[in-house]
Amino acid sequence: MKSHIQSLLEQAIQTLKQQAIIPADFEARIQVDRTKDKTHGDFATNLAMMLTKVARKNPREVAQLIIDSLPQNSQVAKVEIAGPGFINFFIDENALTNQLMAALSDDHLGVTLPTPQTVVVDYSSPNLAKEMHVGHLRSTIIGDAVVRALEFQGHKVIRQNHVGDWGTQFGMLLAYMEELRAQQGEQAQVELADLESFYRAAKVRFDESEEFATRARQLVVELQSGDEYCNKLWREFNDISLSHCHEVYERLGVSLTRADVRGESAYNDDLEQVVRDLDAQGLLSESNGAKVVFQDEFQTKEGEPLPVIIQKADGGFLYATSDLAAMRYRSNVLKADRALYFVDLRQALHFQQVFSLARTANFVRPELSLEHMGFGTMNGEDGRPFKTRSGGVVKLVDLLSEAETRALELVRSKNPDMDEEELAKIAKVVGIASVKYADLSKNRASDYIFSFEQMLSFEGNTAPYLLYAYTRVAGIFKRAAEIDLTGASIKLEHDKEKELGNKLAQFAEVLGRMVAKGQPHALCGYLFELAGAFSSFYEACPVLAADSEDEKKSRLLLAQLTAKTLKQGLDLLGIETLERM
């Protein structure tokens, strides 16, 4: 409905341009907001106040001109001017009930699909040769939620798991395997079962032995030169590491597959060409033997030029080089309209620089939108990045296991008579959902405190609260299984029915905001408010004990649409629902 109001205002603007009341070349930014106080209508805009200067009239005069220019529309009951020049729209009640009935019969809940775009989404992207840790959680689940929402809207989404599968760490691992095989023969292969321990042991050797470090660097050169033995081992490391990653993805309910992996190594053959192309355009400079690009808009605090390093003095390449190659591929081969990067906010400057350079060098099409969807850190209760008690990195699998264990204790305390098998199934869903929702419900740009106690609470904006809210709504239909709703329709007569109906009608609008800004917390907040609106409705409006059959069926339809919206919303967040808790 919000987009419908915007469309009506756009038509009014065109009429005012034709009447020469406002300049034909004026680009009006139309903002429509939902009102908090329904006595002021359902939607409001400050458009008249924005046009005052160009129309050379006072805001209320402009507001009246806009209203007079609005096309007749059956979905709008009336339009009023308020205060200094706000325009308030009152939606026709029949239009709202028609919208709700349409959503009820539609798999997409009445979400009008926009013009489909090709959207490349770079997310998760862990460094291989180590197990995933808590630092990988945010990119993985925020990116996946946005991917699901984009696909729900009808866009073509190309997932890109830009894993760190190349670099000096592999020389270190190759050297350690070589050393172990000299000592243990083929038994050395067993050590790879615990890749994290293998990596730590290799790092100790690298730090303590200059001879080992020299050999590691030599093996990197051999790997990059295509040495068959080195490449075979490298593929083994990657395969084992990716297997660990996909076990985590499966537990998290994340949609990434092996087919979505396109790591740094995929761009190895393009890196020299990136250097040549930048050089041919006169963009490269030399600084201490390295090849760099200086851009006027990027400077240090002292006003010194801040370079993008393209190639080190020893000939090695950096993240910027492979990122530029990846951007060119995503623009010119994948033909992306948008490229979204779900990467830590601490990389903001890096992305500002490479996005700017990619455009300067014409590596990407002008119409491609490059967007860094940065996020804050997940911190412990001391406000510092989340660590183990000994100060080590927390493995993601360990975090998920602890969440499931704590959820099992919680569910068992609520259902002491439930059999262990069902308890375990419910605990798995609740545990994983709690970890994901606790993260997704926070503004992605903010740091947040990780707390098992808060995330497993049945009160507040948490996964257990929403999962329980869904089972409560779904439970109504178990008691009303024999009621035939064929031919029934929604009627909004009680204030709480209207509040619930208005909240249900906002689903498409919230989804649009989540997709445009890459902010799953908008959807989380909406689902929490929807659950609250249903709770208020259920307390004030008897459903199965309604005064009439028509009223009972209308309220059952509202409950049905609420259940459908909660289930779909949680699914878009990658959260499984339960029929019983």
UniProtKB/Swiss-Prot annotation:
Which GO BP terms apply?
Answer: arginyl-tRNA aminoacylation
What chemistry does it catalyse, as a reaction equation?
A: tRNA(Arg) + L-arginine + ATP = L-arginyl-tRNA(Arg) + AMP + diphosphate
Primary site of residence:
cytoplasm
Single annotated GO MF: arginine-tRNA ligase activity
Query: In this UniProt entry, which cysteines form S-S bonds?
Result: none
Q: Where are the transmembrane segments?
A: none
Q: Which family does it belong to?
A: Belongs to the class-I aminoacyl-tRNA synthetase family.
Quaternary structure and interacting proteins, as annotated: Monomer.
Tell me the protein's name: Arginine--tRNA ligase
